[in-house]
Amino acid sequence: MNSMSRGYNGSCGKDNRKEEKCPTIIKCGCPSSNTIPAGTTATTTFTLASLTLDTSCICDPSIKLEFASNPILTDFVGTVNIQVFKQCRHQFTPVPVGPVWTLSIATAVTDARTFSFFICDSDSCDHDCCTYTVVATVVGTDTVGTLAINNATLGAIATCRESCKECKKGYDR
């Protein structure tokens, strides 16, 4: 259809659409890599990925966090627990979000695989800025071999719940 066609609307129907009152944020963290060397002792922690998310324009936010990585095992034996933590303004310590995910290898393996999961965080306050961090913790016995966790990436999609449909931040969009 061109501008001379019948029914042409130069505003592309924008006048007929209602403005969306519930913004959505999509944010991706930067990929990173970490190596867990042979002989790493239990309780040793490694930060795999992180991102900071400002939900100040979202009322009653619901956040879906997605983690993906590419573990490379070289004669690796050991167990690593992986968990997401969040730390918001005015909090002194990070708070766990969702369950613990476990990568456990019982016999020496040289392998490449994917490790990914998603969780939802619906326990956030309005008008808050939080940093989400994915932490790996060695558990059980000392590790054997090496585990390289490559391209560890954390992403987030945040939007408001059905009960809240208007941005309360004081600026024009």
Predicted regions and their residues:
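Extracellular jelly-roll beta-sandwich "head" domains, especially the C-terminal globular C1q domain
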Residues: 2-173
